[in-house]
């Protein structure tokens, strides 16, 4: 069996069960922030476990354009900040990374000069108004395409003033963009969320010496520069989800993911797995550099449908596509609500997964903010349009495990490199394949 291609179509033809112990690459959210916060700091930042994937490369190129130096020393990446961030000499291309674009919009709002942020075709279809509008309240001078709705974003950096922001939807990216702008603003900046989103920004800034006030759903900062320091990036639970969900639903499976980040704002998946009846165990639980981590084992069991809504949604928003796959194998109905955010990711993930799983034989009803899935349902092989969305591609590679040996054909797997270049190799490893999972 040949190695999986890095671009173009791929035929997935694997069989379970999934068994073994693996480590997934470093957390993407923490990796982005490590580079960006390092560039804002007064001293050097050393990062262990940085994710080596295209999205993070976009952030690296961006901070280098702003004057930071980023170099590799052995297993660490070292960020040396400039005395002050400089105006970039060219357009900053964020590739497929919405995190890069939104967080940089916040930072550059307070950096004197002109900056232009753009990205690939997928990123240029993702909304930016919900970042632009609250930043304008702080005095930011911003404009964007299509009536300020879509990238590219033009930033004319200048003086900012603190403000109190009430977010209509919990979003770690919007929250982080506003807090980062607050580091350049006069007065206090406060962000209030309807539910708690991932809190890596708060933890990391505090770990770098920035006074961060957290009270319930409120987070506040004032003007400050981080001091830099050391960041140890745990494994990404959003990447581990493909293996954990596959193992939970595929009879005879047991998978352990070592050194996995288990920050409580990210562990909605573990709660859902338990609610559905999976055997979930955590071992070697510890905290390193302010982030909890553990070795997480999931063993297959008979799954039952459940309801996923409300405050759980921000804690597993990126994992929902593969949760939808898992739900097709659970007895009864699984209902997902309050997940409208899925419609403005790299693709409309609700529509994409709903249409693709339906063609594969799933019984699924779509709502504006979620779906209902009835199971268990044997799936069949299907051709998949990945829509340049890494999570659609990887979720449907997992779905193929439930297709009774029939292949799933992904039209283009280049998108997987944005977050998880080693995905197919690790899936081969736990499924007992030689390599690649491609057509024989």
UniProtKB/Swiss-Prot annotation:
Belongs to the EPSP synthase family. Gene3D superfamilies: Enolpyruvate transferase domain. InterPro entries: Enolpyruvate_Tfrase_dom (IPR001986), Enolpyruvate_Tfrase_sf (IPR036968), EPSP_synthase (IPR006264), EPSP_synthase_CS (IPR023193), RNA3'P_cycl/enolpyr_Trfase_a/b (IPR013792). Coiled coil: none annotated. Pathway: Metabolic intermediate biosynthesis; chorismate biosynthesis; chorismate from D-erythrose 4-phosphate and phosphoenolpyruvate: step 6/7. The lineage of its organism: Bacteria, Pseudomonadati, Myxococcota, Myxococcia, Myxococcales. The active site is at residue 318. 3-phosphoshikimate binds at residues 28-29, 33, 171, 173, 318, 345. This is 3-phosphoshikimate 1-carboxyvinyltransferase. It is an enzyme of class 2 (transferase). Keywords: Amino-acid biosynthesis, Aromatic amino acid biosynthesis, Cytoplasm, Transferase. Its EC number is 2.5.1.19. The gene is aroA. GO terms for molecular function: 3-phosphoshikimate 1-carboxyvinyltransferase activity. Catalyzes the transfer of the enolpyruvyl moiety of phosphoenolpyruvate (PEP) to the 5-hydroxyl of shikimate-3-phosphate (S3P) to produce enolpyruvyl shikimate-3-phosphate and inorganic phosphate. Monomer. SUPFAM superfamilies: EPT/RTPC-like. CDD domains: EPSP_synthase.
């Amino acid at each position: 069996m040949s190695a999986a291609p890095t671009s173009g179509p791929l035929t997935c033809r694997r069989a379970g069960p999934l068994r073994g112990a693996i480590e997934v690459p470093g957390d993407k959210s923490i990796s982005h922030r490590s580079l960006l916060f390092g560039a804002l700091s007064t001293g050097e930042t050393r990062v262990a476990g940085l994710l080596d994937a295209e999205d993070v490369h976009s952030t690296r190129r961006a901070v280098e354009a702003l004057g930071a130096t980023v170099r590799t020393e052995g297993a660490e990446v070292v960020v040396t900040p400039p005395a002050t961030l400089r105006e970039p000499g060219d357009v900053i291309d964020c590739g497929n990374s919405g995190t890069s674009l939104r967080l940089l919009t916040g930072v550059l709002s307070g950096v004197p000069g002109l900056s232009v942020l753009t990205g690939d075709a997928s990123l240029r279809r993702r909304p930016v108004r919900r970042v632009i509008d609250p930043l304008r309240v702080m005095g930011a001078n911003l404009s964007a395409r299509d009536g300020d709705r879509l990238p590219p974003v033009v930033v004319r950096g200048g003086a900012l003033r603190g403000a109190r922001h009430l977010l209509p939807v919990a979003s770690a990216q919007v929250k982080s963009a506003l807090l980062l702008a607050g580091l350049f603003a006069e007065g206090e900046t406060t962000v209030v969320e309807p539910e708690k989103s991932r809190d890596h920004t708060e933890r990391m800034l505090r770990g770098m010496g920035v006074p961060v006030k957290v009270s319930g759903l409120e987070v506040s900062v004032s003007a400050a520069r981080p001091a830099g320091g050391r960041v140890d990036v745990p494994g990404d639970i959003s990447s581990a989800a493909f293996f954990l969900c596959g193992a939970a639903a595929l009879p005879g499976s047991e998978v352990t993911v070592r050194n996995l980040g288990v920050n409580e704002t990210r562990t909605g998946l573990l709660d859902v797995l338990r609610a559905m009846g999976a055997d979930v165990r955590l071992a070697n639980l510890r905290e390193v550099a302010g982030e909890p981590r553990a070795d997480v084992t999931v063993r297959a069991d008979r799954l039952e449908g459940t309801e996923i809504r409300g405050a759980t949604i921000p804690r597993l928003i990126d994992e929902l596509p593969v949760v939808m796959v898992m739900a097709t194998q659970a007895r009864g109905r699984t209902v997902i609500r309050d997940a409208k955010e899925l419609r403005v990711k790299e693709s409309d993930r609700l529509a994409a997964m709903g249409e693709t799983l339906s063609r594969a034989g799933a019984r699924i009803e779509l709502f504006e903010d979620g779906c209902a899935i009835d199971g268990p349902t044997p799936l069949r092989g299907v051709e998949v349009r990945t829509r340049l969305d890494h999570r659609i591609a990887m979720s449907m590679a997992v779905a193929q495990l439930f297709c009774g040996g029939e292949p799933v054909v992904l039209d283009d797997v280049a998108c997987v490199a944005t977050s998880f270049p080693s995905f197919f190799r690790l899936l081969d490893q736990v499924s007992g394949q030689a390599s690649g999972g491609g057509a024989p």
